[in-house]
From Swiss-Prot:
GO cellular component: membrane
Protein topology in the membrane: Single-pass membrane protein
Pathway: Secondary metabolite biosynthesis; terpenoid biosynthesis
Family in the record: Belongs to the cytochrome P450 family.
UniProt xrefs under InterPro entries: Cyt_P450, Cyt_P450_CS, Cyt_P450_E_grp-I, Cyt_P450_sf, Cytochrome_P450_monoxygenase
Keywords: Heme, Iron, Membrane, Metal-binding, Monooxygenase, Oxidoreductase, Transmembrane, Transmembrane helix
Name by which UniProt lists this protein: Conidiogenone synthase PchP450
Gene Ontology BP annotations: conidiogenone biosynthetic process
Transmembrane segments: 2-22
UniProt entry tagged with the keyword Transmembrane helix: yes
Length: 491
């Protein structure tokens, strides 16, 4: 026993000496405890609950723009270095395998570690999500928006309170499922907008940091019978049911040349016979199909939630946007993008929402230079959109929702829109950015034109980011964006 304790003590001492003196990142600034052990991150993200991002912010205030935040990871809080970390397709950037496995869809594009394999998988779907292709979807998107309008008109007649973020989640889920899978989920038909699915995604996100440190829990959950899992954790069971539905649709597509109900789908591209056999399996189609629903609903809804809260919380902003919309001859996506104040509202919403977690990358083929520092090849490095979007040099009073900052920047010749990184940048930029923007422009303009709304028991604590669970989570999570609603009175 004494020998075992001596061996353990020797191992710990050796590890401490290596990480502080001989590790490739040992010369970079940062807290010694963070360099020694990931328990530093564990404390802030697991014990305190999603608070490490703000501890990293404090580190940068103390140590400067580049900091060693874990034994194996550097964090850079310089907006000008963002495109070095998240570089274009000609420069290889691999993901961290320990992080992407948390997605639970191991063969999806999002979970693909290798740069080359990701590029080939992305190329298959690029055309489906190009701006031109999404513009061709406008009639379908408008149809779903009008379906939402009908539901909201019923709420006006009945005097019921609407949970606007649940309605948005239903809308975006119906759009992406019909476009990608050929069959709409029809969440807009559900009396509660199928709110349990959105709630389940948020509930699972709340344990993402636990799973990062104990990834075997994710593997174990796959062996728990559905009935048992439903009793233990209904949110996980809801996600499993949706996965099974996507799998069934993918199976139909595989058996019918990529078509579902006779309609061409994204699955058709994924099971093209020219692809290698391992790239057109049922598991692969399920993973990609489910990943699109997960990625295409809650992030878009989060932006809508931020925008509508600020418009309703400060009605002068709402009145200014409504006036601009009333003076616009058209409500098409292309025309809405040209409206200066509307564009400012959208940019502020994107700036104050979205995925804010660190997205680590490795540059296996090159050493990167940042000021006097050389980042060794294959080192984990990251930043967060939070540090770009709240940079006071770029965005004075960064926590203030100020649509006119974009109008002022344009008048001054500043290309401030290039600093919006909500969808990330580079070769792994979110593929669904054009779809998300089309949805947001069309639904927000419709809501502002047609309805008067008032916040119902909602404060900034229900909206403003306080914790990081992948995306930003507010201090008070219950209830969502609840509003009382009535039709706009025409003069």
């Amino acid at each position: 026993m004494l020998l075992l304790w001596f061996g353990f003590f020797s191992f710990v001492c050796g590890l401490v000496i290596y990480r502080l003196q001989f590790h490739p990142l040992s010369k970079f600034p940062g807290p010694k405890l963070a360099a020694l052990t990931s328990l530093y991150e564990f404390y802030y993200n697991v014990v305190l609950g999603g608070r490490y991002l703000w501890e990293i912010e404090r580190m940068h205030e103390q140590y400067g723009p580049i900091v060693r935040i874990t034994p194996h990871e550097l964090h850079v809080a310089d907006p000008n270095f963002y495109t070095e970390i998240y570089a274009g397709p000609t420069r290889r950037r691999d993901k961290d395998p320990r992080l992407v496995r948390l997605a639970g869809q191991p063969t999806s594009m999002f979970a693909t570690v290798d740069h080359g394999l990701h590029s080939s998988r992305r190329a298959i779907l690029n055309n489906y999500f190009s701006k031109r292709s999404i513009a061709g979807l406008e009639d379908m998107i408008q149809g779903k928006v009008q379906k939402l309008v009908k539901r909201l008109n019923i709420a006006c007649d009945q005097g019921t309170v609407v949970q606007l973020d649940a309605a948005s989640s239903a809308l975006t889920a119906d759009i992406i499922s019909e476009y990608a899978h050929g069959v709409s989920l029809d969440y807009l038909d559900d009396v509660n907008f199928n709110n349990e699915v959105a709630d389940s995604i948020l509930s699972l996100a709340s344990v993402v940091h636990v799973l990062k440190f104990f990834p075997f829990l994710l593997d174990l959950s796959k062996f728990i019978p559905d009935k048992v899992l439903e009793n233990l954790w209904s949110h996980a069971a809801n996600i499993l049911r949706l996965q099974k539905l996507v799998r069934a649709q993918a199976d139909v597509a595989l058996q019918n040349g990529g078509k579902v109900n006779g309609q061409a789908t994204m699955f058709g591209a994924l099971c093209d016979p020219s692809l290698p056999a391992q790239e057109r399996t049922l598991d692969r189609l399920q993973d990609e199909g489910f990943s699109l629903i997960g990625g295409g609903t809650e992030t878009t809804t989060g932006t809508l939630k931020v925008i509508m809260f600020h418009l309703l919380n400060e009605k002068a902003l709402l009145r200014k946007l409504r006036k601009e919309l009333e003076e616009s001859p058209s409500g098409t996506w292309a025309e809405l993008e040209k409206l200066p104040y509307m564009r400012g509202v959208m940019n502020e919403g994107l700036r104050l929402s979205g995925v804010i977690t660190r997205l680590p990358r490795r540059a296996p083929d090159e050493a990167l230079r940042y000021k006097q520092w050389t980042i060794p090849p294959n080192s984990l490095m990251s930043t967060s959109s939070h540090f770009v979007h709240t940079n006071s040099d770029l965005f004075p009073d960064p926590l203030v929702f100020d649509p006119e900052r974009w109008i002022r920047a344009e008048a001054a010749g500043q290309r401030l829109e290039h600093m919006i990184v909500t969808f990330s940048k580079g070769s792994r930029q979110c593929m669904g950015n054009h779809l998300a923007l089309a949805e947001l422009y069309l639904v927000i303009s419709t809501l502002v034109r047609e309805f008067d709304m008032d916040l119902y028991g909602v404060t900034a604590d229900n909206i403003v980011t306080h914790r990081e669970y992948g995306f930003g989570v507010p201090k008070e999570r219950g209830g969502g964006l609840r509003v009382s609603i009535s039709r706009v009175r025409t003069p």
